[in-house]
């Protein structure tokens, strides 16, 4: 459990970035995630909102995802190579008004015009929130599949379901 590890093993390495080898401890990851949650709230994200995350794999993607969850919102992964038409359909079906991305990607990706862009780099200037607002019945994430019609169809996963899956995986691979 991330929160438990952040409290009991704060100096242990939580992530090793496969791209550049940078390491981040549980304490650092928690602090960055709490700052991201504050940035999201300051940008207008409310509990139970869906927020897309469009980032390359790495520390920023994990910080963004955790920040979304801590803010009590759900995340919707939208790949950096997603065609605009498919992305627009996902945004529309999910009633999504916010995207977390980086300044390096914003010029390379076309986002729907009515979506507010929140940059991961802006957590450098933020405070952090006190505690997670996530609840077991809140949406943790939505995965859009191609569906039988070829149109994106969202599958909602609640925090309780995601937690059960993680507990099961952890028990199998101890």
Ranges and model annotations:
Residues 1-163, 173-174:
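Carrier-protein-dependent adenylate-forming modules in NRPS/ANL systems
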């Amino acid at each position: 459990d991330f929160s438990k590890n952040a409290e009991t093993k704060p100096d242990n390495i939580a992530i090793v970035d496969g791209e550049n080898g940078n390491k981040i401890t549980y304490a650092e990851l928690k602090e960055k995630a709490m700052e991201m949650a504050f940035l999201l709230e300051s940008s207008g994200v409310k509990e139970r909102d869906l927020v897309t995350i469009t980032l390359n794999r790495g520390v920023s993607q994990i910080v963004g995802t955790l920040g979304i969850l801590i803010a009590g919102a759900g995340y919707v992964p939208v790949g950096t190579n997603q065609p605009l038409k498919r992305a627009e359909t996902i945004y529309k079906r999910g009633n999504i008004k916010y995207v977390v991305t980086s300044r390096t990607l914003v010029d390379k990706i076309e986002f729907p015009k009515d979506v507010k862009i929140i940059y991961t780099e802006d957590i450098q200037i933020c405070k952090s929130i006190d505690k997670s607002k996530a609840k077991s019945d809140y949406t943790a994430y939505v995965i859009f599949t191609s569906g039988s019609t070829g149109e994106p169809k969202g599958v909602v996963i609640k925090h309780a379901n995601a937690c059960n899956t993680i507990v099961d995986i952890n028990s199998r691979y101890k």
